[in-house]
């Protein structure tokens, strides 16, 4: 998790506002103490409630700090209207309202209990030989040891009826909610089992250095074709290419695809890319 308090201090020092994309952190307000960006000094914050709370897909909140300039609060609705739909989903809006009832009905206590269980699970996995990475309180992030991938760990869990949130060559990420039972945590720890493999230092993958051939706008409006990623060396990228969005693109529109990008395509399972004709 980012150090929002420090970022807010820097922003105040330089007289600028701090806006935070808190997509996966809507629940942070209910921790004790609160870890929500607005409570840590942010001026503006967007929470994708549907990611961590019982809200229909697309349901989100835009929060504006009471300490933010009045002009920000006054202009926010007009600014949102520039991009918002004129046909909103009232089902989604209703789910946000119903979520307020859910949050008021013992959610804070259930969240505290689940965070305690997860902390015990982290200790148990560490004792069993796994490297557990720092993460937000409702996530469990396990680094894959030498000779194993996060995907292989995910398959091991799937065989025991446990589905992960995300897996890549390096990590396995699991996400829980206050509605998970103690038995769910026990099954998770049992399914992962013990690890005897070593954690050898791994060199970080360098970011691909793309050569700019044209602007992103020119590339997006140019004729494009989809080709196997392995055959894209030297071609100009037509659409941003990532292993799992949202993420830092391996290649962006208008860049010539180089050997570093090709290696990252292979590593993160990107099989096809759009290139200019």
Per-segment meaning from a language model:
Residues 1-131, 144:
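Conserved PLP-enzyme active-site core in the AAT-like
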Residues 126-253, 259-268:
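Conserved C-terminal alpha-helix-loop-beta "cap" of PLP-dependent enzymes
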Residues 272:
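Terminal helix/beta-alpha structural elements that buttress the NAD(P)+-binding lobe
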């Amino acid at each position: 998790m980012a150090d929002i308090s420090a970022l807010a201090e820097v922003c105040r020092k330089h007289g600028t506002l701090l806006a935070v994309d808190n997509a996966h952190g809507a629940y942070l307000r209910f921790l004790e103490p609160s870890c929500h960006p607005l409570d840590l000094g942010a001026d503006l914050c967007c929470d994708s409630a549907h990611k961590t709370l019982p809200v229909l897909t697309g349901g989100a909140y835009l929060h504006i700090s009471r300490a933010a300039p009045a002009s920000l609060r006054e202009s926010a609705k007009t600014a949102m209207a520039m991009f918002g739909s004129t046909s909103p989903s009232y089902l989604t809006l209703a789910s946000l309202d119903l979520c307020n009832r859910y949050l008021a009905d013992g959610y804070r206590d259930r969240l505290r209990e689940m965070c305690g269980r997860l902390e015990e699970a982290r200790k148990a996995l560490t004792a069993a030989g796994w490297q557990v990475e720092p993460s937000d309180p409702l996530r469990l992030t396990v680094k894959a040891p030498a000779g194993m991938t996060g995907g292989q760990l995910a398959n091991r869990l799937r065989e025991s009826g446990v589905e992960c949130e995300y897996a890549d060559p390096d990590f396995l990420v699991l996400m829980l909610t206050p509605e998970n039972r103690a038995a769910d945590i026990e099954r998770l720890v049992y399914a992962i089992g013990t690890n005897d493999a070593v954690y050898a230092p791994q060199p970080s993958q360098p970011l691909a250095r793309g050569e700019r051939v044209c602007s992103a706008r020119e590339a997006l409006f140019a004729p494009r074709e989809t080709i196997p990623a392995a055959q894209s060396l030297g071609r100009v990228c037509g659409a941003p290419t990532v292993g799992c969005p949202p993420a830092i693109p391996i290649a962006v529109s208008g860049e010539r695809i180089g050997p570093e990008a090709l290696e990252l395509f292979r590593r993160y399972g990107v099989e096809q890319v759009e290139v200019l004709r």
